[in-house]
From Swiss-Prot:
HAMAP family: ClpP. Fourteen ClpP subunits assemble into 2 heptameric rings which stack back to back to give a disk-like structure with a central cavity, resembling the structure of eukaryotic proteasomes. This is ATP-dependent Clp protease proteolytic subunit 2. It comes from Bacillus cereus (strain ATCC 14579 / DSM 31 / CCUG 7414 / JCM 2152 / NBRC 15305 / NCIMB 9373 / NCTC 2599 / NRRL B-3711). InterPro entries: ClpP (IPR001907), ClpP/crotonase-like_dom_sf (IPR029045), ClpP/TepA (IPR023562), ClpP_His_AS (IPR033135), ClpP_Ser_AS (IPR018215). Disulfide bonds: none annotated. One of its GO terms (cellular component) is endopeptidase Clp complex.
Length: 193
């Protein structure tokens, strides 16, 4: 069951009810709290574009608690984060794994954060293929291409050498907030406001 809390706000015209995500959006906060698929990506991209249209100079904050998901959906979010004018701050709450970790690192350098008990996990892309041998070969080439592309972007975002990224993403690589800070995936650990 997916319950979305409602908040009541007092205005000069009386009370107004918002779902919590709409209320957070007014404060330029976007929640990424699920696996990343095309629907989630479309929602996040739409919110980023909307907030840019409201004020292109003011930061946007994305809170991430995600197990990861689709590479193409995640890249749609990543490209939009880089494309829009406002700086995008990222904050890991809980777990940022796989594409969630990639998006955490994609925040504006100096504005990538994690809470003290959060975890970050990086690994190589996952995929599978079936069908004729030529189709399997095409799928394998694509996933190897994506692996190199994602590793290169992460190397640029973290300051780690590409060879280190290739080694460290070979298997699931879980990190505490402290380790993610040392690695360059985040810039600061938040303990309070």
């Amino acid at each position: 069951m997916n319950l979305i809390p409602t908040v009541i706000e007092q205005t000069n015209r009386g009370e107004r009810a918002y779902d919590i995500y709409s209320r957070l959006l007014k404060d330029r906060i976007i929640m990424l709290g699920s696996a990343i698929d095309d629907n989630v990506a479309n929602s996040i991209v739409s919110q980023l574009l909307f907030l840019e249209s409201q004020d292109p100079e003011k930061d946007i904050h994305i809170y991430i608690n995600s197990p990861g998901g689709s590479i193409t959906a995640g890249m749609a979010i990543y490209d939009t984060m880089q494309f829009i004018k406002p700086q995008v701050s990222t904050i890991c709450i809980g777990m940022a794994a796989s594409m969630g970790a990639f998006l955490l690192a994609a925040g504006e350098k100096g504005k990538r954060y994690a809470l003290p008990n959060s975890e970050v996990m990086i690994h190589q892309p996952l995929g599978g293929a079936q069908g004729q041998a030529t189709e399997i070969e095409i799928a394998a080439k694509r996933i190897l291409f994506l692996r190199e592309k994602l590793n290169q972007i992460l190397a640029d975002r973290t300051g780690q050498p590409l060879e280190v990224l290739q080694r460290d993403t070979d298997r699931d690589n879980f990190m505490t907030a402290e380790k993610a800070l040392e690695y360059g995936l985040i810039d600061k650990i938040f303990t309070n406001r």
